[in-house]
Amino acid sequence: VIGGDEXDINEHRSLALMYXSWSHRFIXXGXLI
């Protein structure tokens, strides 16, 4: 169970980082435009 929880946390963290990175690029591009 613990291993499964860690995997879920890692997946959520990866998705969060990808989303934050994408939104940051989108905002920066919008500001430049």
Curated annotation (Swiss-Prot):
Class of this enzyme: hydrolase
Domain of life, source organism: Eukaryota
GO molecular function annotation: serine-type peptidase activity; toxin activity
Summary of the tissues where the protein is detected: Expressed by the venom gland.
EC assignment: 3.4.21.74
Broad class of the protein's primary localization: secreted
A Gene Ontology term for the protein's cellular component: extracellular region
Subcellular location: Secreted
Key words, A-Z: Blood coagulation cascade activating toxin, Hemostasis impairing toxin, Hydrolase, Protease, Secreted, Serine protease, Toxin
Catalytic activities: Selective cleavage of Arg-|-Xaa bond in fibrinogen, to form fibrin, and release fibrinopeptide A. The specificity of further degradation of fibrinogen varies with species origin of the enzyme
GO biological process terms held by the UniProt record: proteolysis
Domain Peptidase S1: 1-33
Keyword Zinc: no
Reported function: Thrombin-like snake venom serine protease that displays clotting activity on fibrinogen. Shows both arginine-ester hydrolase and amidase activities on synthetic substrates. Also shows proteolytic activity toward casein.
Family stated for the protein in its record: Belongs to the peptidase S1 family. Snake venom subfamily.
Subunit note: Homodimer.
Stated name of the protein: Thrombin-like enzyme RP34
Species the sequence originates in: Cerastes cerastes (Horned desert viper)
